[in-house]
Amino acid sequence: VRESHNSRSMRGIASIVRESRPAAGPIAAAQLDAGADAAKDAMWGGAARLSASGATTMSDIVTESAACPAHALEVPKLEALPKGAAPQLTCYQLGPHAAPIIPGRRDRAWMDATSEHYAYRCLPLSMANTSGWEITSPLDFEVTWNGNQDINAITARAPGVDPNVLRALITSHFAHGILTFHTGWLFRTSPGWGLWVRGAPNDAKDGIHALDGMVETDWLPFPFTMNWRFTRPCTVRFRKGDPFCFITLCPHALLDGVAPRRASIEDDPKLKADYVEWGKSRAEFNKLLRDGDPAAVAKKWQRDYFQGKAGGGDAPFHVNKRRLKPIE
């Protein structure tokens, strides 16, 4: 990964992993790092590109003019964008071995394991799971950290995989138990928009933790890495199809302009009345459940939020299922 002041500032953001396994036993992380650049050149080659067009919603992935080099882009104020225009996400594929990108999936194994799948009744969980795109592992691999802080402390296994492929995908560039992955993509977003890069929401992996990053992809002319930090010495596994990175568009240029305001609930009588009514309704329904009321037991849970209903009316805008578009 090319280093600069900006890339160093993004290292803490990293949140994507890539995988592979060596053909003959573990490969030390130092060896992985040493051969990574040459292997990536062989793997990812020139300027292959993948994009889709026809933006009608925020989730569209659209083509950006190849005639506009990254370093020449100017970032206009967001108010200069057409009203209602969907932000753009262009995914420049850096070669034939870039990891698959798919719309975020709702399901989680731990949510499936809850009684009657009740975790899916929490709409914010499901919406978070699907509010972005997953970058997924193309194969099975495992990595081990021995607890030391040097770059040689991480070894990797990917039986049957060319060691050069492994070296192109994972390194121990930052040491300290941090595993670095290359996605095989360079992303470009609309002016003022960046990518929030992280692990898949609500999807923990024992022994290792995905690091979050906010990347200014509206101007960045090189790819970012995805980094995971071991939480203890152990071996962790990624299976083919597991998400190792999750990307979500974020209007980062607007955030510094947000001015949080303290207010009393008494300042908004309508909001207070709706809040009090919600609390009363919830308490009554939960009491009926505890008492075994047949109607409440049959209903199981209140669905007002799921259905976008509040204060006796419908929400002006409500979504209970994401429909993000895939790359075509």
Model-derived features: positions:
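Low-acidity, Ser/Thr- and Arg-rich intrinsically disordered low-complexity segments
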Residues: 2-11, 15-21
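Ser/Thr/Pro/Gly-rich low-complexity, intrinsically disordered segments
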Residues: 6, 19, 29, 39-40, ...
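Residue-level detector of intrinsically disordered terminal segments
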Residues: 9, 42, 56-57
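Residue-identity detector for glycine
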Residues: 12, 25, 35, 45-46, ...
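Residues marking helix boundaries in flexible regions
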Residues: 14-17, 28, 44, 62
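Non-catalytic terminal segments and appended small domains
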Residues: 54, 58-220, 234-328
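Aromatic sugar-binding surface patches on proteins
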Residues: 220-226
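Short alpha-helix capping/helix-loop boundary micro-motifs
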Residues: 228-232
